[in-house]
C-alpha cells in the first residue's frame, strides 16, 4: 500500500517550478553517456548488477537529491511556491501581515438605569447620580461568551429617556445609553529578565492564543515605565489620548520604552520583543551618531580595513530601551471565533462592573440604588467574530499586505487612513477631498459626522485636532490639507403622478413613496455625490398603477430648510441651493463640498393629478 504522505509530497514537488528539470533516470542516462565516452577502457560493463551500474546509481541519486534541494531553496524564495510552513511563515512576516488570528465579535450594548428626577425639573434626572460605566467592564452571555466594554459609557450627556415612573411618591426616569463591546477575556502575565541577560532584543512569548489587543505593558521600575506598541522598533512616537474638559484630543508623544509584536500563525501565539538600548532614554530622537564610530588616523595618510562590531550600530536608544533586569507585567485581551457571534439579547449580566459618579464625593446609598437598577442587553446580534486563517488563506493575503504603505500618496490612501482612525479619538461619517481653487499646494478635506439620531452634524474642534495630528504622521512633506465642515443640504422629493383608474390612489401613492425611499438609499450619499433624477422617475413609473409623471424634472428635488418648514416636529438647517442651477440632463449636482440629506421619510411628497 502506497504512503499517501509521500505521494502528496512528490506531487507537490513535480507540480512546482523546477530550476533543473531532471530526475534520476535522466541523470543516469547522461552519466552513462559520459562514462562510455571517457572511461570505456576502464569499465565496459554498466548493467544493473555490475559495479559500473552501482556507481551510476549512486551518482544519479546524488544528482537528483542535490537538484531537489536546489529547487526547494529556489521555490522557498517565492511565497507562491513555498511549501514548507517555516518558509511560508517567513514570507507572511516579511509582508507584515496581521489579522490571521481568530477575531473577536463586536456588538452595541444598551445600558439602562433608573435615576431619581431632579427636584427643580422633573423632566430631567438628578445629575449628581448619573454614573460613568468605564471601559473594560466585563459582561457575560447566556451562552458563556465574555464581552468587554471598549469605551466609557457616560450618562452625563446624550442619554435617552425611555419612560418616567413614580415609586413611594418619588419620581424616577429610566435612562438608556449604548456602548460598544467586543468579545474576549482579559488576562495578566508577569515575567522577569536577568541583569546578566546577554540576548539582544529580549523577547517573551505570552501563554494564551489569539491575542487581539495588548492593553498595557509596564515594568517594576520605581517610575513604573509604560511600554508602547509600535510597528517597528525604530518608530519612536505613538498616539496618546488626552481628555480635556470632556473633549478627547489626539497627541503624538515620544515612546522610548516600546515593543513590537511577532505573531506565530502556526500555533496562534504572540511574542513581545523589546528594544536593545542600555536603559537610556533618547533625548534627541536621533539614531546613533556615525561620528562616534569613526576611527582617528594618526601618523599616516592611509587606513586599512578594520573590523567593527555591528552591535555598535544598533545598540542605540533609538531602537527602544531594553527591560533587562526588570519584571514586566502585561495586560491583554485574547479570544475570538465564529462562536462569539452571539444572538440578539444574549448578553445577560455583568462579570465585573467598573463605575464612578463624577458629581459625588462619596458613593452613597442612593448611588448604590442606581447601580443596582442597572440592566444590560444587546438588541442586535454580534458580528465580526471569525476563526483563525489557515496558512493557505494567509498566503493569498500576502499580495495585498505587500502593497500597503505607511504614507498617504493618493486620495484613496487618505480616506482609508481617516476611516481607520482609532475610534477612541472620534468617528467621521463621510469624507471627501477636493482641489483648492486658490492654491495648487493644498487640498480641501471635507468631513461630516452623525449624532445619536443619525443626523449629520459638524465635526467638533477636538475631532478636527485629532484628524490633523493623525494624518500629519502619514502625509508626504509638502502636502497640505484644510479640514473643512461639509455643508448639509436637507432635501425633499416632490412628484405629481397620474394613476390608472383600476388602482387605489392612496395605495399607489404609498407604494411610490416607499420604493423611492428604499431604492434611492439617500442615506448612502457621499459628500459631493449627485442625485440621479431619472432614476427617481423610473422608480415611480415602474410602480404598478402609475401612468405618467407630470412634474417638472428640475423641481423633483427641492431645498428643505428652516424657512420653508411648516411642520413643528421637524427641524432643518439653514443651508439652501438652487435645484434649477444645479440640474443638468437629469442629474442634480451637489454644491462644492456639500452633501444631500433626506432627513425624514415624510419629506417624500407624492400627489395625484
PLM region spans:
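Signature of Asx- and small-polar-rich beta-strand/turn repeats characteristic
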Residues: 1-609
Amino acid at each position: 500500500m502506497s504512503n499517501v504522505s509521500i505521494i502528496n509530497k512528490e506531487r507537490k514537488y513535480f507540480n512546482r517550478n523546477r530550476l533543473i528539470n531532471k530526475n534520476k533516470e535522466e541523470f543516469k542516462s547522461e552519466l552513462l553517456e559520459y562514462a562510455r565516452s571517457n572511461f570505456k577502457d576502464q569499465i565496459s560493463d554498466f548493467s544493473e548488477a555490475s559495479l559500473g551500474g552501482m556507481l551510476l546509481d549512486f551518482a544519479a541519486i546524488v544528482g537528483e537529491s542535490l537538484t531537489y534541494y536546489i529547487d526547494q531553496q529556489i521555490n522557498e524564495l517565492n511565497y507562491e511556491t513555498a511549501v514548507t510552513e517555516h518558509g511560508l511563515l517567513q514570507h507572511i512576516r516579511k509582508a507584515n501581515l496581521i489579522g490571521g488570528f481568530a477575531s473577536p465579535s463586536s456588538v452595541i450594548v444598551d445600558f439602562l438605569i433608573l435615576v431619581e428626577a431632579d427636584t427643580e425639573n422633573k423632566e430631567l434626572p438628578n445629575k449628581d447620580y448619573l454614573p460613568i460605566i468605564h471601559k473594560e467592564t466585563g459582561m457575560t452571555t447566556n451562552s458563556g461568551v465574555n464581552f468587554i466594554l471598549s469605551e466609557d459609557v457616560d450618562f452625563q450627556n446624550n442619554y435617552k429617556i425611555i419612560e418616567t415612573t413614580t415609586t413611594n411618591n418619588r419620581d424616577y426616569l429610566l435612562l438608556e445609553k449604548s456602548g460598544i463591546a467586543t468579545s474576549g477575556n482579559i488576562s495578566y502575565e508577569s515575567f522577569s529578565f536577568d541583569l546578566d541577560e546577554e540576548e539582544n532584543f529580549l523577547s517573551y512569548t505570552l501563554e494564551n492564543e489569539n491575542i487581539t489587543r495588548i492593553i498595557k505593558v509596564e515594568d517594576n521600575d520605581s517610575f513604573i515605565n509604560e511600554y508602547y506598541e509600535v510597528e517597528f522598533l525604530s518608530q519612536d512616537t505613538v498616539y496618546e489620548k488626552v481628555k480635556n474638559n470632556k473633549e478627547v484630543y489626539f497627541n503624538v508623544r515620544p515612546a522610548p520604552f516600546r515593543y513590537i509584536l511577532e505573531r506565530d500563525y502556526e500555533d496562534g501565539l504572540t511574542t513581545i520583543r523589546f528594544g536593545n538600548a542600555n536603559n537610556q532614554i533618547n533625548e534627541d530622537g536621533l539614531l546613533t551618531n556615525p561620528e562616534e564610530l569613526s576611527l582617528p588616523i594618526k601618523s599616516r595618510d592611509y587606513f586599512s580595513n578594520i573590523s567593527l562590531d555591528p552591535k555598535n550600530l544598533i545598540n542605540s536608544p533609538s531602537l527602544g530601551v531594553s527591560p533587562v533586569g526588570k519584571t514586566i507585567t502585561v495586560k491583554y485581551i485574547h479570544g475570538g471565533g465564529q462562536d462569539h457571534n452571539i444572538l440578539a439579547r444574549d448578553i445577560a449580566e455583568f462579570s465585573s462592573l467598573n463605575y464612578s459618579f463624577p458629581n459625588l464625593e462619596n458613593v452613597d446609598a442612593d448611588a448604590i440604588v442606581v447601580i443596582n437598577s442597572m440592566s444590560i442587553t444587546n438588541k442586535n446580534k454580534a458580528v465580526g467574530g471569525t476563526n483563525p486563517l489557515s496558512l493557505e488563506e494567509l498566503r493569498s493575503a500576502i499580495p495585498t499586505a505587500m502593497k500597503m504603505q505607511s504614507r498617504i500618496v493618493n486620495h484613496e490612501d487618505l480616506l482609508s487612513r481617516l476611516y481607520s482612525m482609532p475610534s477612541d479619538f472620534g468617528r467621521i461619517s463621510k469624507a471627501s477631498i477636493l482641489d483648492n481653487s486658490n492654491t495648487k499646494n493644498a487640498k480641501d478635506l471635507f468631513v461630516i459626522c452623525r449624532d445619536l439620531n443619525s443626523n449629520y452634524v459638524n465635526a467638533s474642534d477636538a475631532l478636527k485636532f485629532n484628524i490633523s495630528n493623525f494624518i500629519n504622521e502619514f502625509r508626504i512633506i509638502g502636502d497640505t490639507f484644510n479640514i473643512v465642515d461639509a455643508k448639509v443640504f436637507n432635501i425633499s422629493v416632490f412628484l405629481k403622478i397620474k394613476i390608472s383608474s383600476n388602482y387605489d390612489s392612496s395605495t399607489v401613492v404609498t407604494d411610490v413613496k416607499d420604493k423611492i425611499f428604499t431604492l434611492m438609499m439617500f442615506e448612502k450619499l457621499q459628500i459631493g455625490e449627485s442625485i440621479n433624477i431619472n432614476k427617481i422617475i423610473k422608480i415611480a413609473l415602474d410602480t404598478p398603477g402609475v401612468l405618467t409623471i407630470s412634474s417638472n424634472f428640475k423641481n423633483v428635488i427641492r431645498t428643505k430648510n428652516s424657512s420653508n418648514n411648516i411642520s413643528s416636529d421637524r427641524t432643518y438647517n439653514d443651508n439652501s441651493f438652487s435645484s434649477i442651477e444645479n440640474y443638468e440632463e437629469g442629474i442634480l449636482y451637489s454644491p462644492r463640498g456639500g452633501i444631500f440629506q433626506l432627513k425624514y421619510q415624510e419629506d417624500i411628497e407624492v400627489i395625484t393629478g
